A protein has these predicted regions:
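Conformationally flexible catalytic loops at phosphate/diphosphate-handling active centers
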Residues: 138, 142-199, 347, 354-359
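Active-site-proximal loop->helix
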Residues: 33, 56, 99-118, 243-247, ...
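Short internal beta-strands
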Residues: 21-23, 94-96, 153, 229-235, ...
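Conserved thiamine diphosphate
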Residues: 108-146, 178-183, 265, 310-311, ...
Length: 373
């Protein structure tokens, strides 16, 4: 049995059922062994695409994505995708191999760790056969717990070596990763932010990917109906509020003219499960008159060089929204926002031929890209 067989078995044991790959010297034997274990493969024509597909797989399945490219120039090609995965906190494991230990010279040799850490990802270098299975388990557990991608580098001559009489103990990271459970808000903080919500006259509620994962969409719609808020989403959460007639689609750079007007006029933005990135706030210019309430398991104060939120509720997205709804019911004479205001905005959105009024030339027989947003 070769060492790459053990590597493949250890990765298969982590619940991996699919791998996105572009093969080369540093990963071909490992990939072959993994395929023989009935792990299906999707092959890319560019290394960046392999990582991007693994990112999409992780987002759809909720499980860490697996990609593999060769060492050296194969790794340098994935830096854009790897950086994007770090910023989006997408759990991902990338197996890249490494230049051979015993070669006196190797044309594609580079110091890989600095490239990986420059992207914000973590690098695990496997150099000792007795630690192979444990380091692979650790890589998967770290990405599952932190959402930070982990890159595994292992010299390909070490991969091709005989395993010998060493014991093989393989354990799944999922058996050791603790369940995070739901995050419940502090009652005192709920009362404080509820008072803020009750006073809002032109509220806007924005749902992000965290709201999608927490199944907070229906609760957000109920809160919006209660306080007279219009509904928007970040681009990754597009469609979350499609059942509401008061949904103005996405916020940020792709926002419609009507959505932008709602944000500019709003006095309170309730951001649920979104990272409050610069794109969603038009670099902070989109809400000039609004206080921002962030409901998230990891509330953000500063984001990308600006103050992102003024008020915070640390909670699971659905639980936090439901807590505010319940607290609003206890406030006598709670003044909700202007339902007439949001009805007018919804009517304007429906009447618009396109989300924005900017001139845009569309060639004959070509789909207008605005129809995709």
């Amino acid at each position: 049995m070769k060492t790459y067989d053990v590597v493949a078995k250890a990765i298969k044991a982590q619940g991996v059922g699919h791998c996105f790959a572009l093969l080369g010297d540093g990963n071909m034997h490992f990939a072959g062994a993994l395929a023989h274990l009935d792990v299906s493969f999707t092959y890319a024509r560019h290394e960046h695409c392999a990582v991007s597909m693994a990112m999409a797989y992780a987002r759809v399945t909720g499980q860490p994505g697996l990609a593999t490219v060769t060492c050296g120039p194969g790794l340098t090609q994935v830096m854009t995708g790897l950086s994007a995965a770090v910023r989006a906190r997408i759990p991902l494991v990338l197996f890249v191999g490494e230049s051979p230990l015993r070669a006196s010279w190797y044309n594609q040799e580079i110091d890989q760790a600095p490239f990986v850490t420059a992207c914000g990802a973590e690098y695990v270098r496997i150099l000792h056969k007795p630690r192979v299975t444990r380091q692979i388990q650790d890589a998967f557990s770290r990405t599952q717990m932190s959402g930070i991608p982990v890159v595994i580098g292992m010299p390909f001559d070490l991969q091709e070596s005989e395993w010998g009489n060493l014991n093989v103990t393989i354990e799944a990271a999922s058996d050791f990763v603790p369940s995070a459970g739901k995050v419940f808000p502090d009652p005192g903080v709920v009362d404080a932010v509820t008072a803020l919500v009750a006073q809002a006259k032109r509220p806007v509620l924005i749902g992000g990917r965290g709201a999608v994962l927490a199944d907070a969409g229906p609760s957000c719609i109920r809160l919006a109906d209660k306080i007279g808020a219009v509904l928007l989403t970040s681009l990754p959460a597009r469609g979350l509020f499609h059942r509401s007639i008061h949904s103005l689609n996405v916020v940020g750079g792709f926002a419609s003219d009507t959505a932008r007007k709602a944000c500019l006029d709003s006095d309170l933005v309730i951001a649920v499960g979104t990272s409050l990135a610069s794109h969603s706030a038009d670099a902070g210019r989109l809400y000039p008159n609004a206080k921002i309430l962030h409901i998230d398991t990891h509330p953000i104060i500063y984001q990308q060089g600006r103050v992102a939120a003024h008020h915070h509720l640390c909670a699971d997205a659905k639980i936090g929204v439901d807590a505010i709804l319940n607290a609003l019911g206890d406030i006598k004479g709670c003044s909700s926002g202007s339902h007439e205001w949001r009805d007018e905005l919804a009517a304007q959105q429906k009447a618009a031929e396109y989300p924005d009024a900017l001139p845009f030339q569309v060639a004959p027989d070509v789909i207008d890209p605005r129809q995709m947003i």
